[in-house]
C-alpha cells in the first residue's frame, strides 16, 4: 500500500479542485491514443481515429476521457485505499477488455503532462512528485487483477 503524506495529499487535491474534468479527460485520452497509437485497438467502436485531429475532436474520446478522469477523482477521494477503489475496474479491464496493464502507466504519464500544461508554474517539482506517486499507485491498483 502506498502512503501519501499530508503535503502530498494537499498538493494533489489543490490542483484537482481546479481541474476541468471534461476538458482534461478528453485531452488525456486523446493524447494517449495519438502518442501510443497501439492503444487505439481498445477503442475500435469509437469511429474515426485516423488522425490526431480526428482523435482529439472525437466526441466518444472526449466522453470516455471524462469517465476516466472521473475515476481519477475517485482515486483522490480514496488515496489510502486504491486497491479496493479500483477492484471492479481492474477486473473489467483484465477479464473482459484484456487491456495490457502497461497502458495504465502510459495513461498516468499522459495525465502528468496534461497537468503540467494546464497548471504551468503551479506544477512544481514537488507537486509533480506527488502526482507521479498517485498515477503510479493507480496504475498498480488497476493492474492488480492481472497478478
Swiss-Prot record:
Modified residues (Phosphoserine): 14, 51
Keyword Metal-binding: yes
A GO MF label: hemoglobin alpha binding
Keyword Metal-binding: yes
Keywords of this entry: Heme, Iron, Metal-binding, Oxygen transport, Phosphoprotein, Transport
Tissue: Red blood cells.
Cited CDD domains: Hb-beta-like (cd08925)
UniProt-recorded name of the protein: Hemoglobin subunit epsilon
Residues annotated as domain Globin: 3-147
